[in-house]
């Protein structure tokens, strides 16, 4: 029996969930501080009591749009469902929650599943078992939103979980090469997208291009994609309305290259819509 089976109760690691905060409006530099949009309030006590990973950030539809996966697929990963008269438990959540809100940790873990979904059908049962094993061993509800499984000392745990769950090679996160544990290409691509703070995923690069400065972070623009704190959607709207790139860059105190990156990212979203 794998060393991962230690009888831990995964429910003990689960934290209370809190509701998402209001969305912030991006304004050009020079906007008066008493502008109503600047005075939007946020329940900071709620933000403080919920961990970053457990914070509800997006509607299910918005998360699916940002991940560029069908909403039905994301819902299947989050809450499970039925396929050919067989009921499947969730892959990401411990239990179905029945709502349409997505936490930051759930979004990040769905980003990992997306890396595998590009070329394969995600095996629900095996991945569920695999994540359950990591959840039990690490004592956290969302183990793949933590850095530990991906660094050298945590890869042995991942290897054991892969073996114990019967996960096929196409879906493995680590592989043994010349006696060393290395990340598989999908896992490595995922890790490169994440900004780690300590052990947790504190940021995410939604753009496929590794050079892109577009980032998502739960404490910046309420998790929406941004460049240097300015929403890419807002920048795209200004350009779409006919404003010049240099004009928009100057208004938001950004480099022209930042605007180009924001447009490139937004164009991928609009193309996938």
Predicted regions and their residues:
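An extracellular/luminal cadherin ectodomain-centered signature
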Residues: 92-93
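Residue-identity detector for glycine
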Residues: 7, 19-21, 30
């Amino acid at each position: 029996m794998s060393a991962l089976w230690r009888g831990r109760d995964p429910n003990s690691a689960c934290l209370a969930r809190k509701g998402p905060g209001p969305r912030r409006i991006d304004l050009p530099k020079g906007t008066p501080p008493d502008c109503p949009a600047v005075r939007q309030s946020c329940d900071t006590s709620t933000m403080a009591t919920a961990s970053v990973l457990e914070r509800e950030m997006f509607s299910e539809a918005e998360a699916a749009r940002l991940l560029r996966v069908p909403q039905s697929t994301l819902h299947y990963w989050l809450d499970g469902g039925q396929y050919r008269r067989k009921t499947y438990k969730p892959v990401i959540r411990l239990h179905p929650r029945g709502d349409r809100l997505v936490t930051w940790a759930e979004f990040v873990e769905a980003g990992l599943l997306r890396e595998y979904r590009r070329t394969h059908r995600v095996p629900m049962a095996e991945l569920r078992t695999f994540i359950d094993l990591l959840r039990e061993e690490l004592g956290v509800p969302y183990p793949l939103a933590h850095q530990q499984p991906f660094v050298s000392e945590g890869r042995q745990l991942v290897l054991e979980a892969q073996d114990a769950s019967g996960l096929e090679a196409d879906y493995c996160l680590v592989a043994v090469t010349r006696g060393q544990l290395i990340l598989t290409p999908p896992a490595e691509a995922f890790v490169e997208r994440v900004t780690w703070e300590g052990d947790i995923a504190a940021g995410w690069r939604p753009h496929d291009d590794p050079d892109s400065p577009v980032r998502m972070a739960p404490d910046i623009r309420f998790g929406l994609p941004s460049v240097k704190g300015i929403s890419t959607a807002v920048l795209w709207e200004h350009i779409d309305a006919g404003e010049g790139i240099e004009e928009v860059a100057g208004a938001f105190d950004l480099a022209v290259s930042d605007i180009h990156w924001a447009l490139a990212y937004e164009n991928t979203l609009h193309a996938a819509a």
